[in-house]
């Protein structure tokens, strides 16, 4: 179920349990490659009684752009807002924050602001913004050297596989770091460690030394998942392992759904030039209809993606295209193909 909240697009997975899960995704290309994985994890958790919400950071994916540029605080505030929306719509009372990549830092910072944090799941964590930016730059250099093309990005840009980070956010990240010894003692934490990455296992040890109840497991399939979206290898055994950990470590008592949780609320995002609404086609396909703000359109274009790329497209190309066309009076429908 799609939801909107202060210009942010999210996806809610209903369940009746008292513990909800907020998904804090990685950035850019990594987020593109893990949409399906996170959907499958959220679906499995919902079957086990854990409601959850996935969302696009402000200025990313389907969420509205930030007028003066996104900051790291903007992202953390979006995670806090997503937790409030999850509580409002499902009645869950405590939140476990899941973060992957730089999203692990978002998750930890959001959890610090939640007096009913239930725990954390941290996957392929990047807890130093400066180190993360260096890794992004190295990955992009490998891509550009491999294909021998100069894309003409502005000097100093933070880019990965056609995704360009907001300069204000990149500047913010240089000063962002998280000290794990501030995690509350006895909180359950699941660490998904990349094979042959000592930093992930060091993180698990540091969390344990700080008093957290830590489980560390291999992030099997990590490399294949982030290799692109031409194929869609999913680590189904890992998804089962994650679900089993939740069932063991987190209470899943049922709660009553709040009376103001109205599923018929319109999922609308709008600006002075366009308005967008999430649509479900034949109960199977998800897409976003983008129309001119005037309500008058001269044509409708269907935007389809290649392989397993979600509807926002590489570098958010279809989101940008749809909103540009809406300004010119043309409506579009960008859609996820089956099994995304």
Task: Enumerate the predicted regions with their spans.
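The alpha/beta-hydrolase serine catalytic core
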Residues: 5, 114-243, 252-253, 259-264, ...
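Gly/Ala-rich beta-loop-alpha elbow adjacent to hydrolase catalytic centers
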Residues: 98-107, 124
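N-terminal cap/lid segment of alpha/beta-hydrolase-fold proteins
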Residues: 1-19, 244, 248-299
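Terminal, non-globular segments
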Residues: 1-11, 46, 53-55, 198, ...
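Catalytic nucleophile-loop/oxyanion-hole region of alpha/beta-hydrolase
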Residues: 60-94, 338-340
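Short, surface-exposed "cap/lid" segments of acyl-processing enzymes
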Residues: 15-56, 292-337
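Short glycine-enriched, charge-decorated loop/helix-capping segments at active-site entrances
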Residues: 37-38, 66-71, 231-232, 317-318
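Active-site signature of alpha/beta-hydrolase-fold catalytic machinery across serine-
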Residues: 109-113
């Amino acid at each position: 179920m799609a939801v909107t909240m202060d210009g942010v697009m999210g996806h809610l997975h209903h369940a009746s349990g008292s513990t909800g899960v907020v998904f804090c995704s990685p950035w850019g290309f990594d987020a593109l490659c893990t949409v399906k994985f996170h959907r499958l994890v959220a679906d499995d958790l919902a079957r086990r009684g854990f409601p959850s919400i996935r969302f696009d950071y402000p200025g990313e994916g389907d969420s509205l752009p930030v007028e003066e540029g996104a900051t790291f605080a903007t992202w953390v505030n979006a995670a806090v807002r997503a937790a409030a929306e999850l509580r409002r719509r499902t009645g869950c009372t405590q939140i476990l924050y899941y973060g992957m990549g730089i999203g692990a830092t978002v998750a930890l910072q959001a959890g610090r602001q939640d007096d009913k944090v239930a725990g954390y799941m941290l996957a392929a964590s990047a807890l130093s913004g400066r180190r993360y930016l260096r890794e992004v730059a190295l990955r992009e250099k490998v891509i550009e050297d491999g294909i021998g093309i100069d894309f003409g990005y502005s000097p100093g840009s933070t880019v990965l596989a056609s995704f360009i980070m907001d300069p204000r956010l990149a500047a913010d990240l240089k000063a962002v770091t998280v000290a794990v010894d501030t995690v509350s003692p006895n909180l359950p934490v699941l660490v998904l460690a990349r094979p042959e990455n000592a930093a992930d296992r060091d993180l698990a040890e540091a969390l344990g030394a700080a008093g957290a109840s830590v489980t560390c497991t291999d992030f099997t399939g990590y490399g294949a998942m982030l290799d692109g979206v031409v194929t869609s290898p999913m680590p189904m055994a890992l998804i089962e392992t994650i679900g089993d950990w939740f069932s063991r470590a987190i209470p899943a008592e049922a709660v009553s759904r709040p009376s103001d949780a109205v599923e018929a609320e319109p999922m609308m995002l709008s600006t002075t030039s366009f308005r967008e609404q999430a649509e479900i086609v034949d109960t199977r396909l998800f897409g976003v209809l983008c129309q001119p703000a005037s309500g008058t359109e001269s044509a409708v274009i269907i935007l389809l993606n290649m392989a397993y790329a979600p509807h926002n497209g590489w570098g958010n190309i279809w989101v940008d295209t749809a909103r540009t066309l809406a300004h010119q009076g043309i409506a579009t429908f960008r859609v996820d193909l089956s099994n995304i």
